[in-house]
């Protein structure tokens, strides 16, 4: 006798339930990607298309004039305002590239020097015994609880007294002491046996040799994690660069982007240029994270921080 009714595959039912559980994740991904998609498409639209209501999801005609040359966009008006992104600053030696150069110089310098100083300090705190070590470590941890905004005015006065306004020194030097990096790397180094360092000392290795040959290779995952934190944080830093610069040629990308927005406030024609500048500003940090995300996750996991 044949059974009546249809047979339901339990695996198919489980698969559907799994897809439903993932639906909020898919929606969240769309919400996260939407601003970037809007930024890219708006930077490729003409002035006329930017004024269309409702706005178009795809550019009807791809316009590159927002990035480089306004001659690609015959609808642009007010030539001195609507000049392409990389031609808006004829008084600067490298145009908009000048802001990119400033950002890269400042970011690379701060990131490299901060990691060197932080790793050296973490090595001393975690693998050396000296009087006052615990007190110094408590000071490092305590300084993490002080809001960084507290040091803005004293920091500016000090930089001004040193004559560093509108120089790279004002960007780099105040950003070097980072307590969180010392704390993070110290936590990571506690997982490395002290016997390894002691054995190297018995074999006659100098402290620099131990640091360079043993500590740095073992710190690689944690250093990459801190590199991402530092690089992204300094790349997006706005308030301090705004305070210490009075000349346009020393501005970084976030400051230049804010100035660009203020100069075109209320002008729909500058929206495409602003979106293009925003895209250029965000590309390096996105690329850095995607290139190092595996090391980043590993460094966070092995540090013992939750």
Question: Could you describe each region identified by the protein language model?
Answer:
Residues 9-13, 17-306:
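A structural signal for multi-pass alpha-helical bundles of membrane permease subunits
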Residues 1-8:
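ABC-family P-loop ATPase nucleotide-binding domain
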